[in-house]
Amino acid sequence: MAFLDNPTIILAHIRQSHVTSDDTGMCEMVLIDHDVDLEKIHPPSMPGDSGSEIQGSNGETQGYVYAQSVDITSSWDFGIRRRSNTAQRLERLRKERQNQIKCKNIQWKERNSKQSAQELKSLFEKKSLKEKPPNSGKQSILSVRLEQCPLQLNNPFNEYSKFDGKGHVGTTATKKIDVYLPLHSSQDRLLPMTVVTMASARVQDLIGLICWQYTSEGREPKLNDNVSAYCLHIAEDDGEVDTDFPPLDSNEPIHKFGFSTLALVEKYSSPGLTSKESLFVRINAAHGFSLIQVDNTKVTMKEILLKAVKRRKGSQKISGPQYRLEKQSEPNVAVDLESTLESQSAWEFCLVRENSSRADGVFEEDSQIDIATVQDMLSSHHYKSFKVSMIHRLRFTTDVQLGISGDKVEIDPVTSQKASTKFWIKQKPISIDSDLLCACDLAEEKSPSHAIFKLTYLSNHDYKHLYFESDAATVNEIVLKVNYILESRASTARADYFAQKQRKLNRRTSFSFQKEKKSGQQ
């Protein structure tokens, strides 16, 4: 090991030792940096300093002439040495040698024509094609599974299996629904079938998915192969079908409805099934009436009372005041709850609170309910749209589409290219909940082609009125449909509206009476 303290000698040693062996470029950086610093310390103009330069054989100073190696090219980054011609040639020969190894040379020889027929026959020997015996090996797992699940192959609802969302929970929007099956036996219908569907599916697709899962699980009885033979109804938590509302529209997406409990009901569309008519019992209450559907006349009056109270209180817990049933024709006489409907010989009853009496004339309504009126009342909850004209304050009209169903009334403007140019015709869509509806009255009927009706509803603690006009037949149908809906619902807003209207009428009557009394005294 040698210790040197002369930077010039050290730099010269690095320069000569790493001319061809430095591939990192580190020596170039050392030479450039230290030579610059050394030049600043020992400028070349200073004479007599023998320690800062090395004398060559020709007597000239060589201290900084060879400060940088001639074989290292200075660049922005590290130095890169160019390859010599010999190295490039050796690399080319190596690649050619590797390519020759990959090639195979075959020597061409002339075919010997003196070959016997036996030798030619041995070249293409005839093989015996015998039928192989059937393989009696073990069956594959797929074959075994297909034999165990024959219903999967013969399921007529396989096309709806793509809407099954059980494998997409957490990754895609899904909806879990409990479906009751009234077509089951009396014990199986109490337990719902849980279905997980894609949120993008329609109601028709959900019906097909329910039928597919029903068939895959091997349930009985078998379903009709036609999906259109079924519909979905709103159901209570105990499986009771709510017939006051129409079935869900098959073309609507399922995510539009927030119901978690539904019932799959068969449509009675064939002529043989149309004779199966439902039985309805009318229950009068203080602010309207309800139609309770029963399967037969063997049902007890206690079951009818429970349904009536549940229908009156809705989703609230059945607690608080107790009620009893009375015949419409026999006031203040309670009905025996253990008796059957058949033994009562009546189809109309009154719901009266315990420890109270029914006043005369409180429930005086037409007790004669024909089947046509019942059908009109039930169909009034089905959605139907009408094209009418909405009358504004300045007496100009706007064409709108009036959609009426059992749960709400929708008013959508019908815009046309001609009407869109007028700045005042900018009617916004309006949606009115049925619980906020108060009244629907015929305002004017001039001719069969022109009539006006008024719709009253509650908005922000204030009663608002909307006026519409159309032909007389359409107006009468709308008024009748809305009034059927209002009579079948015990709306608080409607009761308050009539109470306020009655108070105004009484105040006006008393004022006119006092005025007449004063004029008589004079």
From Swiss-Prot:
The keyword Transmembrane does not apply. Phosphatidylinositol 3,4,5-trisphosphate (PI(3,4,5)P3) promotes MTOR activation by relieving MAPKAP1/SIN1-mediated inhibition of MTOR that takes place in absence of PI(3,4,5)P3. One of its GO terms (biological process) is cellular response to insulin stimulus. Component of the mechanistic target of rapamycin complex 2 (mTORC2), which transduces signals from growth factors to pathways involved in proliferation, cytoskeletal organization, lipogenesis and anabolic output. In response to growth factors, mTORC2 phosphorylates and activates AGC protein kinase family members, including AKT (AKT1, AKT2 and AKT3), PKC (PRKCA, PRKCB and PRKCE) and SGK1. In contrast to mTORC1, mTORC2 is nutrient-insensitive. Belongs to the SIN1 family. A 1,2-diacyl-sn-glycero-3-phospho-(1D-myo-inositol-3,4,5-trisphosphate) binds at residues 393, 428, 464. Component of the mechanistic target of rapamycin complex 2 (mTORC2), consisting in two heterotretramers composed of MTOR, MLST8, RICTOR and MAPKAP1/SIN1. The mTORC2 core complex associates with PRR5/PROTOR1 and/or PRR5L/PROTOR2. Contrary to mTORC1, mTORC2 does not bind to and is not sensitive to FKBP12-rapamycin. Interacts with MAP3K2. Interacts with ATF2. Interacts with MAPK8. Interacts with GTP-bound HRAS and KRAS; inhibiting their activity. Interacts with IFNAR2. This is Target of rapamycin complex 2 subunit MAPKAP1. It is a peripheral membrane protein.
